[in-house]
């Protein structure tokens, strides 16, 4: 395992080597998950690209830090990590809140970003009352109070029916997220609105969404794609909010095709 201390916290990360002439891909996970969600995509891409993934603060094996957070707390952690590892001009692939981090990163440190893959995300995710309600449930009932609704939004009906062991595993991942990490990041999502920034993105962008995403539905992601000049849009069938889990081969192929199209 790989760890680094920066910005007064310790981050858990994984750096995977690849061809020197290929762009690095940086993966940013969603709320209440850790970087293991990218495992099957990384397996498909191993040997083709250098890759970096990490547990953002308050998640996985990384420190919680001072909660609540602002989106720039997460962005600054990624900036420091990429600078420490001397990674720049990378393809930034962010899922859900990871997409917010990716979009913001492209504005504050454009030298770190060559292109964006925005998975199951939007420049504005949800409403303040929605996030306040979820945060109150978490404060009162812990992560268990949010589990059922989140699993229904995250995964397809087929996954619930035919992948019960995997569903149990991802439920365990969700339940073990530190409460302060969840609350801190939920507050950051609540307070973030990047719609004006999205309309000014001047990079190659691929917007991806699972057909059965119950958190950031396809129409919301398509709206984002239409907002970003020149952005591509990909609907992944047989996937919910986390296509890297349900359709890793499709997402890996989508990433590869998008990156090769930029040469």
Question: Positions of the model-derived regions?
Answer:
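Conserved HGGG/HGGXW glycine-rich cap/lid loop of the alpha/beta-hydrolase fold
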Residues: 9-64
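Active-site loop/oxyanion-hole signature of alpha/beta-hydrolase fold enzymes
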Residues: 39-46, 52-93, 253
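Flexible "cap/lid" loop of the alpha/beta hydrolase fold
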Residues: 100-108, 112-147
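Conserved alpha/beta-hydrolase catalytic His-Asp/Glu region
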Residues: 126-129, 140-200
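Short beta-strand/loop motif that positions the catalytic acidic residue
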Residues: 201, 207-209
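Short alpha-helix in the alpha/beta-hydrolase fold that links the catalytic acid
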Residues: 203, 217-226
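Acidic catalytic loop of the alpha/beta-hydrolase fold
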Residues: 211-216
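Catalytic active-site module of serine/aspartate enzymes centered on a nucleophile-bearing elbow/loop
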Residues: 231-263
């Amino acid at each position: 395992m790989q760890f680094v201390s920066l910005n007064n916290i310790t981050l858990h990360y994984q750096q995977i080597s690849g061809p020197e002439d290929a762009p690095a891909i940086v993966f940013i996970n969603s709320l209440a998950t850790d970087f293991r969600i990218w495992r099957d995509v990384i397996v498909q891409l191993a040997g083709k690209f250098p890759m970096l993934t990490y547990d953002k603060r308050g998640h996985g094996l990384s420190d919680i830090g001072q909660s609540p957070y602002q989106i720039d707390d997460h962005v600054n952690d990624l900036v420091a990590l990429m600078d420490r590892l001397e990674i720049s001009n990378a393809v930034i692939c962010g899922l859900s809140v990871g997409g917010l981090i990716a979009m913001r990163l492209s504005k504050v440190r454009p030298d770190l970003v060559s292109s964006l893959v925005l998975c199951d995300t939007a420049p504005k995710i949800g409403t303040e009352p929605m996030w306040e309600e979820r945060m109150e449930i978490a404060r009162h009932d812990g992560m268990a109070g949010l589990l059922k609704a989140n699993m229904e939004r995250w995964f397809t009906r087929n996954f619930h029916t035919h992948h019960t062991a995997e569903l149990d595993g991802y439920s365990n991942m969700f339940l073990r997220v530190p409460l302060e990490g969840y609350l801190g990041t939920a507050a950051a999502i609540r307070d973030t609105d990047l719609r004006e920034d999205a309309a000014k993105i001047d990079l190659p962008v691929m917007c991806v969404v699972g057909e059965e995403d119950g958190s950031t539905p396809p129409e919301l992601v398509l709206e984002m794609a239409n907002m970003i000049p020149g952005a591509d849009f990909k609907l992944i069938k047989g996937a919910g909010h986390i296509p890297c889990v349900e359709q890793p081969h499709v997402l890996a192929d989508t990433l590869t095709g998008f990156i090769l199209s930029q040469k």
